[in-house]
């Protein structure tokens, strides 16, 4: 497709304004700082393109354990299910110093991740991967995928 054709398609496309309701889980550690900045980015995109983002904060992870005694409440799951998307920060803390890791496994911060993935029908945690040519024969990934 040529640049001119792409330009004309963009010009002829109807402008669609998006309204998105987000559950926001700031999480632990650096999570609150990163998610706060991500929300600023979304708000800037919204201002520029006429989109609206509405946020409702819910607790998950260590901050939820501190506030409620569990890594993710059923009420928080219900809020997440009612939204269009979930904006999620980091969950958990330093395993050697955080008091959360003295708790039984089902009450640790990561149990909230497992619960929300199950409740929302999510199954993958995708992360980018770099494969160096020198190591391609040692990698279990297939080149054709």
Regions of interest found by a model, annotated:
Residues 36-39, 92:
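Short, function-defining helix-loop hinge/capping sites that tune catalysis or transport
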Residues 18-29, 47, 52-54, 62-145:
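Anion-binding alpha/beta catalytic cores of soluble intermediary-metabolism enzymes, centered on
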Residues 3-17:
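Short, Lys/Arg-enriched N-terminal segments with co-localized hydrophobic residues
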Residues 39-49:
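Short catalytic helix/loop segments, enriched in acidic residues and glycine
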